[in-house]
UniProtKB/Swiss-Prot annotation:
GO terms for biological process: chaperone-mediated protein folding. This is DnaJ homolog subfamily B member 6. The keyword Phosphoprotein applies. Keywords: Chaperone, Cytoplasm, Methylation, Nucleus, Phosphoprotein. Residues 2-146 are annotated as: Interaction with HSP70. GO terms for molecular function: Hsp70 protein binding; unfolded protein binding. It comes from Pongo abelii (Sumatran orangutan). The modification Phosphoserine is found at S277. It is found in: Cytoplasm, Perinuclear region; Nucleus; Cytoplasm, Myofibril, Sarcomere, Z line. One of its GO terms (cellular component) is nucleus. Its main location: cytoplasm. Has a stimulatory effect on the ATPase activity of HSP70 in a dose-dependent and time-dependent manner and hence acts as a co-chaperone of HSP70. Plays an indispensable role in the organization of KRT8/KRT18 filaments. Acts as an endogenous molecular chaperone for neuronal proteins including huntingtin. Suppresses aggregation and toxicity of polyglutamine-containing, aggregation-prone proteins. Also reduces cellular toxicity and caspase-3 activity. The lineage of its organism: Eukaryota, Metazoa, Chordata, Craniata, Vertebrata.
Amino acid sequence: MVDYYEVLGVQRHASPEDIKKAYRKLALKWHPDKNPENKEEAERKFKQVAEAYEVLSDAKKRDIYDKYGKEGLNGGGGGGSHFDSPFEFGFTFRNPDDVFREFFGGRDPFSFDFFEDPFEDFFGNRRGPRGSRSRGTGSFFSAFSGFPSFGSGFSSFDTGFTSFGSLGHGGLTSFSSTSFGGSGMGNFKSISTSTKMVNGRKITTKRIVENGQERVEVGEDGQLKSLTINGVADDDALAEERMRRGQNALPAQPAGLRPPKPPRPASLLRHAPHCLSEEEGEQDRPRAPGPWDPLASAAGLKEGGKRKKQKQREESKKKKSTKGNH
């Protein structure tokens, strides 16, 4: 017999908030789209977690479960005894996907981490000592508890919202999220973008989750600064993305926009009539030796050798003619 308290990993006296936290953690962990390599077990665990949450999050269902177990929910508890149960004709569990979507208010839970910056200020979370976090009085879950659940036919949704510093501490400037696909379809993909001003600089974080792989791009004032895949920095992917965006080199300045050279002062021309024009100066100015070229040097040595041999032959002829005259 499955124990719903054990499924969620909570005590029998757990508070409703503890049950919500446990469901959130396990539902994200065992969602089939996050476990493509172990989908059968993930679907089974995902269904159990949804059933446990559906029972323990409802006060009446939880009370009957505590007294009579799962049989009480099916209308059979008490060995034929007469007890007042609203589920005497049997309780039917909902589709786990519907429970999941209703819990998260129709928003994409994979687009960002509810406990990570830059969203913790927006949701009222505060960072505690040693990096731990405690939730504020305004729970994220209660904020979206009034949203209706999506029908089972809906497998994709996209949503976004924008704030202008009026919520939290004013650090979050904008956020948008889009999702494609859904459970049972595979090819799940979500894209979220957040923008936050930090010390006068615009920090943009783009998070892409597709079939269990998370890619995070962080830019500063329009320049891509870092790229991680599943939490690990990828320099090759960063260089490729920067090249694709044309961020490797500074834009060249068009020739037509270069400032013209300032004309020479007239007074300087009057007192220095002997000054040469720039063209004349270039012609008369001695040329600085250029960089050494091995091919040119070899050609020069060869030519020099020819001249030396020719000079030696001419001197030899002169000596012979001189001896003949004597």
